[in-house]
Amino acid sequence: MTNPLKGEGGLKALGKTWTLKLPFAEAQRLKSELGVDLINDGASMADLDKFDGVLLAMLRKAHPDATPEVALEILDEVGMKPVIDAMQPALAAFLGVSVEELKKGGERPQ
């Protein structure tokens, strides 16, 4: 069960519920391995060739056995919009803003 108050998003796909969360270590990995800088260039996470990597990073905390193939299967089954919606609580908690601010494209914390 997901808890948005703890920065968790939930997504139903592949016959189960997936919990998405973005620990700092995963954000560091995204920047070093994929060049996705969530603090200074959040739009970089939407690149099609990187989006599955962002999803995988958010899955790893609750689902350490998740693989790149699982991330792609989830995207194939539900599409990007439900995944983006599920990512929002995790991304907002990581950035230290509310989901509403994130949706409005609010200022990034300094």
Model-identified regions with their sequence ranges:
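Charged interaction scaffolds used for protein-protein
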Residues: 1-13, 28-49, 63-110
